Structures are given as C-alpha cells and as structure tokens.
C-alpha cells in the first residue's frame, strides 16, 4: 500500500479517536488500533516513513513514536 494512503488512514483514525481526549491519550488509542488491526506489512511501511514528515498530524506522530517504542513491527 502506498505510504501517502497509510498516512491519510492514520490521520483519519487519529481524528476519529481524538475528541474529548488529550493528544497523548488519543495517540495511545491509535497505537492500540494499529497494533490490533493493521497487518505487519502496513505497520512496517508506516514506520519506515520519517517521523518528521509534515503530513502526519500531531496525534499520529505521537502514536508512531509510541509504536516504535513497542518494537513489535
């Protein structure tokens, strides 16, 4: 899957899970979603995108950082 498409999906998930939550809490939910529902290939691909890519929302950046710390990709 194309990286831009994954970034868009990740940002949409971040937006959907963010209402009434801090960025950190929303990012934790996004990380959990990615871990549970994205294939290893999708996780590897999104983690290969540089984290300073401006297309990532703030919540997405935090979620990616947290996912990298898990080291399960």
Predicted regions and their residues:
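N-terminal acidic leader/helix
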Residues: 1-24
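Charge-dense, helix-prone N-terminal extensions
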Residues: 4, 59-62, 72
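Surface/interface-facing alpha-helical segments and adjacent flexible terminal/loop regions used
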Residues: 4-5, 10, 27, 42-44, ...
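Amphipathic alpha-helical segments within well-ordered protein domains
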Residues: 14, 31, 46-47
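Short amphipathic alpha-helical interface segments
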Residues: 25-32
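Short alpha-helix boundary/capping elements
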Residues: 35-42
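Short, charged early-sequence alpha-helical segments and their helix-coil boundaries
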Residues: 42-67
